[in-house]
A protein has these predicted regions:
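Exported/periplasmic ABC-transporter solute-binding proteins
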Residues: 1-19, 24, 28-35, 43-52, ...
């Protein structure tokens, strides 16, 4: 995102002010009337908002799929996560587990489901450290002084955080791949420039950057 906002500023002289929140919070803010020119969220949510008339339907453009992954501090050994049994054992061994809002963040909601599937939700509840979004959760993991701590969030949020490293995506039936898109707000104050930035986000010129950041076609 920072590379694209810098390029956009060089091209237009306009500064992009981005707000990073769980998808549920973004929806609440948009519905409440908070100023917004462009929204990046799940494709499902953008389609819903387009049906409600809050997003211009023909501007919705796919960014790609993002998997939910497991992270550890950069200096820690990567735990085994390739099977249900291995993931469960690694979670049980972790002294602390970091995740985004389990009520409104896509990855947080899914991770709680994973814990229930593994029958670990009650056992691990005291070790869960929840944060407003995935980036905040990963930043907290990076600051942790507990060796072996684990984090779970979208791979894009893991890759942008200094001090943590990606172990890998959740596997098999525990996997979650979420489609993300961008769309123009129906009440955008600067629709022309918002459309241009959307083109930069979703177009060919940023395809390599999206892939590097964790978006899959």
């Amino acid at each position: 995102m920072s590379a694209l906002t810098a390029r956009f500023f060089a091209e237009t002289g306009i500064e992009v002010r981005a707000t990073f929140q769980p998808v549920g919070v973004l929806r609440e803010k948009l519905v409440a009337g908070e100023p917004c020119d462009l929204l990046v969220s799940t494709h499902v949510m953008l389609e819903e908002l387009a049906l409600e008339g809050r997003i211009v339907a023909d501007t919705v453009a796919m960014l790609g799929r993002v998997r939910t992954g497991i992270a550890v501090r950069s200096r820690d050994r990567a735990p085994a996560i390739d099977t249900r049994e291995a993931l469960g054992a690694s979670l049980v061994a972790a002294p602390a587990i970091y995740l985004p809002d389990p009520a409104r963040a896509t990855a947080g909601i899914h991770f709680l489901k994973v814990l229930r599937v593994l029958a670990l939700d009650q056992e691990l509840a005291p070790r869960l450290h929840t944060h407003a979004n995935g980036a905040a959760a990963m930043a907290a993991l990076a600051r942790s002084d507990q060796e072996g701590s684990i984090g779970c969030t979208q791979i894009t949020e893991i890759r942008i955080t200094s001090g943590v490293k990606l172990v890998g995506p959740l596997k098999g039936s525990l996997e979650l791949a979420t489609a993300y898109a961008v769309g123009l707000s129906a009440v955008a104050r600067d629709g022309a420039h918002a459309r241009r930035f959307a083109e930069m986000l979703a177009g060919r010129e940023s395809a390599a950057l999206r892939l590097q950041s964790g978006f899959e076609p």
